[in-house]
UniProtKB/Swiss-Prot annotation:
NCBIfam families (alphabetical): GTPase_EngA (TIGR03594), small_GTP (TIGR00231)
Keyword Cytoplasm included in the entry's annotation: no
Residue ranges occupied by any EngA-type G domain in the UniProt entry: 2-169, 180-355
Binding site for GTP 2: 186-193, 233-237, 298-301
Family matches, as PANTHER family: GTPASE DER
Binding, GTP 1: 8-15, 55-59, 118-121
Protein's name according to its UniProt entry: GTPase Der
Gene: der
Domain KH-like residues, every copy: 356-440
Pfam family, one: MMR_HSR1
The keyword Phosphoprotein is assigned to this record: no
Length: 449
């Protein structure tokens, strides 16, 4: 896909423009310099064309350790891009950092560079504007004027990108293999970014000892063993009491958005330290999503082990995450690249279980046999009797059980029926949901069998 990198110094509105172009609020917008630290990817559409955009961190001439890492990410974006947007601000005088960015871009000889002047909402059309003339000094020709925050000039910008680069119409993907979207969550410094670097086999996400270095959710397309994946990296989740206003709170929201966009969650914990209340809170977020979870126990290489160590830690996890009893537990060492291949093995197993459709006749055979084997207890003045069951269309396995009266359902018997369905049809690694309805009720979305 044709890819455009958005480059500029801090606070010229790169993230605002990125969000406007892809029409989704993916990148965090803030007046604080260097809010964007990694490369953020998104896709915009314009007149049957699709363009991938890369939001980048702000380039400055000063070389702090963090700025050096940001510059590595920016240069990687420049190498990946087919074209470049050089973004400057109309509301401010040209700075030395603007000229530094221009100097970097002038070294690129094989890619078109489009100068875009942002924050130009007060610019009068067809009027002589002395302030606009200064931008010609960069040597990139006539600029395109936009206001990302007001949505002004975005159509003209997209027209220029399509026309200048002769982009063909997009006719849709030929892929028949559905994409599996998964995110990596966990408290700061458990090794999420290092894991992603290993999984994608390139240095895509900033790795730093500074807690909370990754702030945005980063979408990374992957293809492993013929399966398409979209890996969403997220900022480490802090305790709510420690989330500062502004950027940290926005990152927390981005993590929740990443969970909402995912099919599967990788919940990462530090195996070298005792599980904490913070881990439990994050596990609660995963449980509340009602989607499959894989628990990754990282830094297992640092643990002094005997024959019972792994079993003991699994028991602790099951106690801490009681509502994630279905979640596979994988012990890994990202640093030593140990057992990372099992992550994609588990993802494949989960995907197969998510797409599994059960014959209505087989499902009812299992339910009736379960009731014959173990009759429901008396509860609230009656005894549950399930007469019919169907699987419904949903992201995760959902089953509707028609019964004499839903109020007779005791939680222990519901768990018994759930376990029977799991055992009979191989739903070992995914959450399943049972809905008990009166036998006279109607249900939409029933799977065809």
């Amino acid at each position: 896909m044709f890819t455009v990198a958005i480059i500029g110094r801090p606070n010229v509105g790169k993230s605002s423009l990125f969000n406007r172009l892809i029409q989704k609020p993916y990148a965090i917008i803030s007046d604080t310099p260097n809010t964007t630290r990694d490369r953020i990817y998104g896709v915009g559409e314009w007149l049957t064309r699709q363009i991938a955009f890369i939001d980048t961190g702000g380039l400055i001439s000063q070389k702090t350790p963090l700025q050096q890492q940001i510059e590595v990410q920016v240069r990687a974006a420049l190498s990946q891009a087919n074209a470049i947007i050089f973004l400057v601000s109309y509301q401010e005088q040209i700075s030395s950092d603007d000229f530094y960015v221009a100097k970097v871009l002038k070294k690129i000889k094989d890619k078109p560079i489009l100068l875009v002047v942002n924050k130009s909402e007060n610019l009068k059309p067809d009027a002589y504007e002395p302030n606009l003339q200064q931008f010609y000094s960069f040597g990139f020709g006539q600029p395109v004027c936009v206001s990302a925050s007001h949505g002004i000039g975005i159509g003209n910008l997209m027209d220029r990108l399509v026309k200048d680069n002769q982009l063909p119409p997009y006719h849709g993907s030929s892929e028949t293999n559905p994409e599996v979207r998964f995110c990596v969550i966990g408290k700061p410094n458990v090794g999420k970014s290092s894991l992603i670097n290993q999984l994608v086999q390139q240095n895509r996400v900033l790795v730093s000892d500074e807690s909370g270095t990754t702030r945005d959710a980063i979408d990374i397309p992957l293809r492993v063993n013929g399966q398409n994946y979209l890996l969403i990296d997220t900022a480490g989740i802090r305790r709510k009491g420690k989330i500062a206003p502004g950027i940290e709170a926005a990152s927390y929201g981005k993590t929740q958005l990443a969970i909402a966009r995912s099919n599967i969650i990788l919940l990462m914990v530090d195996g070298s330290k005792p599980l904490s209340e913070q881990d439990e809170i994050i596990g609660g977020l995963a449980q509340a999503a009602l989607i499959p979870v894989i628990i990754l126990v990282n830094k297992w290489d640092l643990v002094q082990k005997d024959s019972n160590t792994m079993a003991k830690f699994k028991k602790q996890l099951q106690s801490q995450f009681q509502h994630l009893s279905f979640a596979p537990i994988v012990f890994i060492s990202v640093k030593n690249n140990k057992r990372l291949h099992t992550i994609f093995e588990q993802l494949q197993i989960i995907q197969e279980q998510l797409t599994k459709k059960i014959s209505t006749s087989l499902l009812n055979d299992v339910i009736q046999q379960a009731q014959l084997f173990n009759q429901a207890p008396l509860f609230k003045g009656g005894r549950l009797q399930v007469t019919y069951a169907v699987q419904t269309h949903s992201q995760t396995p959902h089953f509707v059980l028609f019964c004499n009266d839903p109020k007779f359902v005791h939680f222990s018997y519901a768990r018994f029926l759930e376990n029977k369905i799991r055992e009979s049809f191989g739903f070992s690694a995914v959450p399943i949901t049972l809905y008990f309805k009166s036998k006279n009720a109607r249900i939409r979305g029933v799977a065809k069998t």
